[in-house]
Amino acid sequence: RVSSFMKDFETEAYKLGILLQTRHNEVAPNQFECAPVFCEATKAIDQNMMLMIIMQKVAEKHHLKVIFHEKPFDGVNGSGKHCNWSITTDTGVNLLSPGKTPTKNLQFLSFYSSVLRAVHRHHYLLMASVATLSNSYRLGGNEAPPAVMSVFSGSTLYGVFQTIMNMKDVKESVDSRQESIKIVNSIPEIFPDNTDRNRTSPFAFTGNRFEFRAVGSSQNVATAVCVVNSIVAESLREFRAYVDALEAAGEDRSSAV
């Protein structure tokens, strides 16, 4: 019955131009997941709300009920939304996509560090954007993710930033299979880890985007996206002002960045 219902609402979604790429069960009994294909933020937000309406209407035809409450049953896993967020240029270049050698990819590191700064400075705003009453029954002590905002970067990126912060020379040697990365004279050999491994992080980097995992299942994601856009925009503006000041003082751009 559930499979038939999901196929039907997927068909209705396709008719409205909403593309879906995932269909599988989740941890709780009769809990299932679908994932719209990514697109521009405003369009993705509209499609997300339209999809919720479609699911409710199609469920009635199948004599089912879709529950969007974040924690409808005590002691059973609740529901949420994973908001995948990245930033691209007008020509489609993903500014959060690392190169083959992340320590040399100045553009990636600049934008990545600006996002980290934004989350560090405005973590209370991020939490406020998802702090509904029903979602509070899910976050924190009840189940992952925790209510405390943090970013999981993976050991490779963490090591790169630690090295830069310590003002040591960053050298790297990547073999043809990219099986290991060495940053000489700073940290030991590390194996590339899956940045998606830590499923408890509420704001995790997953290869070429950040995944905000604390959004409630009944929420309009517009608030969360608006907050992320705003705090990152502020961080980038201040980053640009800082670099411009160093350039005005005589430093070249690469050194200033």
What are these regions (language model features)?
Residues R1-F68, F73-V257:
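Glycine-rich, acidic/polar active-site loops that bind/position phosphate-bearing ligands
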